[in-house]
Swiss-Prot record:
Protein family membership: Belongs to the UPF0102 family.
One term of GO molecular function: nucleic acid binding
Family matches, as PANTHER family: UPF0102 PROTEIN YRAN (PTHR34039:SF1)
NCBIfam families tied to this protein: PRK12497.3-3
Record InterPro entries: Restrct_endonuc-II-like, tRNA_endonuc-like_dom_sf, UPF0102_YraN-like
Protein name according to UniProt: UPF0102 protein DIP1513
Length: 122
């Protein structure tokens, strides 16, 4: 796979996940937030006011489950980025979700959501 194909899949997956969360009443606060310590794909606020940091992994093959790509090291980077993003903001409950998106050969997408993931390796 090429870098362009991988980027296309990533954007496709992130758009799909953001729309699914929005359909469930979440406010999509930010996307692709990057700090020197790490990046967050999607930041959303739940209907209950909880800030949710969402890592999206998209795959078009089943060689490796997308969620397995979220290692403890990756989660540490996400936690650090979340800490940076939260600086100076009002206190809120937070949650870390990992969403694995699969794109089949017909371009159909489905997702598996892991809510409240703290250390990776769903």
């Amino acid at each position: 796979m090429t870098a362009t194909h991988n980027h296309y899949l990533a954007v496709l997956g992130e758009d799909f996940v953001a729309q699914q969360y929005a359909n469930e009443g979440y406010d999509i606060t930010a996307r692709n937030v990057s700090f020197s310590v790490g990046e967050i794909d999607i930041i959303a606020t739940s209907p209950q006011g909880e800030v949710v940091f969402i890592e999206v992994k998209t795959r078009s093959s089943s060689l490796m489950d997308a969620a397995e790509a979220v290692t403890p090291t990756k989660m540490r980077k996400i936690h650090r980025a979340a800490s940076k993003w939260l600086q100076g903001k009002p206190f809120a409950d937070i949650r870390f979700d990992v969403v694995a998106v699969h794109v089949d050969e017909y371009g159909e997408l489905d997702m598996t959501r892991y809510q409240g993931v703290e250390h990776g390796a769903c």
